[in-house]
């Protein structure tokens, strides 16, 4: 609170970027964790809550005849354009926010203050909810070819890797140690995913320190061990996710990529995904297009094309599809790396896992995938998300791109994902919120040093407790398949309005056919549940038992039978849910009965209509529960 100069400012106008007529007048509050704007109207009271950690930038604009404007941009793509009557108030809020949204130390992050009213046992169980070892066991490890190793238990071999690794059983300790020394930052080749049916594996690492002509016998033996761990293929793919020109430039700096002359039985492949700086610039250009007030169609489409954003999404998707096809169709193992193996490598490996394994398309499965491929393998969340006041050139929307790839897949396969887009958006918001400890720090070792398991809480129990909000009513377990084969033709990539225009209240609400279908299926399930309950109450009142062969049970039996239909081996992207989308909403996917009906007319998720003006108001947001007492 010592950083807050003025905790309350009245008569602040919240401007609407689409039309001046819809601008609001209200009171601005600053707390230790949130900026709160209370909009006063004749009939309702709306509150907009913005977590300080969500703020990307605060810009004080030139003084105008109407007042002093302040523009707040958020990492969640929310914009607040405030207009103060007094320049002094604007300056005080500006100075306060500069200190509040850019903490210097990890201990100042929200997670170290937040308490969801859990005891220590609940906290411990929350952190143990997701286990990478359990996921390895689910894949079938340990087996004749792969083993779970504790060789990095003290992080001495690689400080940015997890303490538990999947390694080829035939690789000796000397081979593993020598390979680690030959790889950038010690990030040696280790197991990411094992396909039990084809016995092919996806492995990940960083670039070799090969330079122009260096080689390492142990590293060559390591790749040979990976190849021998798959009896169904005589070779492995080595996939460098970088553009070839970038990889060649790194060779001059003593790094680079594998020389095929030195490694037996490898097939090398470049994928051409750009670096973090290009991606950061691309997103900035995309957001500039989104912030245009009244663009022409030509300007909008030109701006979208010039941003290159969807082109980059396609590049990541192409690489993931290549890995999935290699593992599933060619039955070949794949080794993936970029420069350090914690950005593009994480994107591609996790996307391939999602295509290959239906478990990762469930609500809990996606948590496991993020924990395994991103958190434990050292994606630098604190740097990439700008949690602290650090080098802005380290920030990049790498994880945002992965979430968008998942969303793009859900658009092609609307019935094979247990979760909806709100789940992806919630995860994205929580990554930047720092409300929970999962995404604080850059690697597992840093998190242990900060004792996050003792001082903060895990996000995953919170998401599971509220999973009814994130269920996809179209999800059909009967459509689970071994592998997804999405089309990566340009026409299949869409602009994700739900993410980048999530907070734009000025946009005209337009429901898609899918949204309408979701609403209808949810209403149907709610109606059936109500009818079942009324039937039960009537039977109790009459003193008889409900008829087990009644219409409700018959309908439920029909649904159960439909869910037991055999699944096809592969789901193509051309209309897996065509019967439902064409109007047949009779069948409802599992979990739909837990879905809440959405009202598209309601304001954004962090706005609340409150009618009470004199008594304390309890406001529950997606990031906190706080009590606000309005002075009379």
From Swiss-Prot:
<comment type="subunit">
    <text>Homodimer.</text>
</comment>
<keyword id="KW-0378">Hydrolase</keyword>
<feature type="compositionally biased region" description="Basic and acidic residues">
    <location>
        <begin position="602"/>
        <end position="632"/>
    </location>
</feature>
<feature type="binding site">
    <location>
        <position position="384"/>
    </location>
    <ligand>
        <name>a 1,2-diacyl-sn-glycero-3-phospho-(1D-myo-inositol-3-phosphate)</name>
    </ligand>
</feature>
<feature type="binding site">
    <location>
        <position position="344"/>
    </location>
    <ligand>
        <name>a 1,2-diacyl-sn-glycero-3-phospho-(1D-myo-inositol-3,5-bisphosphate)</name>
    </ligand>
</feature>
<feature type="active site" description="Phosphocysteine intermediate">
    <location>
        <position position="338"/>
    </location>
</feature>
<dbReference type="GO" id="GO:0001568">
    <property type="term" value="P:blood vessel development"/>
</dbReference>
<dbReference type="InterPro" id="IPR011993">
    <property type="entry name" value="PH-like_dom_sf"/>
</dbReference>
<feature type="binding site">
    <location>
        <position position="339"/>
    </location>
    <ligand>
        <name>a 1,2-diacyl-sn-glycero-3-phospho-(1D-myo-inositol-3-phosphate)</name>
    </ligand>
</feature>
<feature type="binding site">
    <location>
        <position position="275"/>
    </location>
    <ligand>
        <name>a 1,2-diacyl-sn-glycero-3-phospho-(1D-myo-inositol-3,5-bisphosphate)</name>
    </ligand>
</feature>
<dbReference type="InterPro" id="IPR003595">
    <property type="entry name" value="Tyr_Pase_cat"/>
</dbReference>
<dbReference type="GO" id="GO:0052629">
    <property type="term" value="F:phosphatidylinositol-3,5-bisphosphate 3-phosphatase activity"/>
</dbReference>
<dbReference type="GO" id="GO:0005635">
    <property type="term" value="C:nuclear envelope"/>
</dbReference>
<feature type="binding site">
    <location>
        <position position="276"/>
    </location>
    <ligand>
        <name>a 1,2-diacyl-sn-glycero-3-phospho-(1D-myo-inositol-3-phosphate)</name>
    </ligand>
</feature>
<feature type="binding site">
    <location>
        <position position="343"/>
    </location>
    <ligand>
        <name>phosphate</name>
    </ligand>
</feature>
<dbReference type="GO" id="GO:0046856">
    <property type="term" value="P:phosphatidylinositol dephosphorylation"/>
</dbReference>
<feature type="binding site">
    <location>
        <position position="343"/>
    </location>
    <ligand>
        <name>a 1,2-diacyl-sn-glycero-3-phospho-(1D-myo-inositol-3,5-bisphosphate)</name>
    </ligand>
</feature>
<dbReference type="InterPro" id="IPR010569">
    <property type="entry name" value="Myotubularin-like_Pase_dom"/>
</dbReference>
<keyword id="KW-0443">Lipid metabolism</keyword>
<dbReference type="GO" id="GO:0043491">
    <property type="term" value="P:phosphatidylinositol 3-kinase/protein kinase B signal transduction"/>
</dbReference>
<comment type="similarity">
    <text>Belongs to the protein-tyrosine phosphatase family. Non-receptor class myotubularin subfamily.</text>
</comment>
<feature type="binding site">
    <location>
        <position position="250"/>
    </location>
    <ligand>
        <name>a 1,2-diacyl-sn-glycero-3-phospho-(1D-myo-inositol-3-phosphate)</name>
    </ligand>
</feature>
<dbReference type="InterPro" id="IPR030564">
    <property type="entry name" value="Myotubularin"/>
</dbReference>
<dbReference type="GO" id="GO:0005737">
    <property type="term" value="C:cytoplasm"/>
</dbReference>
<dbReference type="GO" id="GO:0106018">
    <property type="term" value="F:phosphatidylinositol-3,5-bisphosphate phosphatase activity"/>
</dbReference>
<protein>
    <recommendedName>
        <fullName>Phosphatidylinositol-3,5-bisphosphate 3-phosphatase MTMR8</fullName>
        <ecNumber>3.1.3.95</ecNumber>
    </recommendedName>
</protein>
<feature type="binding site">
    <location>
        <position position="343"/>
    </location>
    <ligand>
        <name>a 1,2-diacyl-sn-glycero-3-phospho-(1D-myo-inositol-3-phosphate)</name>
    </ligand>
</feature>
<dbReference type="Pfam" id="PF06602">
    <property type="entry name" value="Myotub-related"/>
</dbReference>
<dbReference type="InterPro" id="IPR029021">
    <property type="entry name" value="Prot-tyrosine_phosphatase-like"/>
</dbReference>
<keyword id="KW-0539">Nucleus</keyword>
<feature type="binding site">
    <location>
        <position position="340"/>
    </location>
    <ligand>
        <name>phosphate</name>
    </ligand>
</feature>
<dbReference type="InterPro" id="IPR016130">
    <property type="entry name" value="Tyr_Pase_AS"/>
</dbReference>
<feature type="binding site">
    <location>
        <position position="276"/>
    </location>
    <ligand>
        <name>a 1,2-diacyl-sn-glycero-3-phospho-(1D-myo-inositol-3,5-bisphosphate)</name>
    </ligand>
</feature>
<feature type="binding site">
    <location>
        <position position="344"/>
    </location>
    <ligand>
        <name>phosphate</name>
    </ligand>
</feature>
<feature type="binding site">
    <location>
        <position position="341"/>
    </location>
    <ligand>
        <name>a 1,2-diacyl-sn-glycero-3-phospho-(1D-myo-inositol-3-phosphate)</name>
    </ligand>
</feature>
<feature type="binding site">
    <location>
        <position position="341"/>
    </location>
    <ligand>
        <name>a 1,2-diacyl-sn-glycero-3-phospho-(1D-myo-inositol-3,5-bisphosphate)</name>
    </ligand>
</feature>
<dbReference type="GO" id="GO:0004438">
    <property type="term" value="F:phosphatidylinositol-3-phosphate phosphatase activity"/>
</dbReference>
<feature type="binding site">
    <location>
        <position position="342"/>
    </location>
    <ligand>
        <name>phosphate</name>
    </ligand>
</feature>
<feature type="binding site">
    <location>
        <position position="339"/>
    </location>
    <ligand>
        <name>phosphate</name>
    </ligand>
</feature>
<feature type="binding site">
    <location>
        <position position="384"/>
    </location>
    <ligand>
        <name>a 1,2-diacyl-sn-glycero-3-phospho-(1D-myo-inositol-3,5-bisphosphate)</name>
    </ligand>
</feature>
<feature type="domain" description="Myotubularin phosphatase">
    <location>
        <begin position="126"/>
        <end position="500"/>
    </location>
</feature>
<dbReference type="GO" id="GO:0004708">
    <property type="term" value="F:MAP kinase kinase activity"/>
</dbReference>
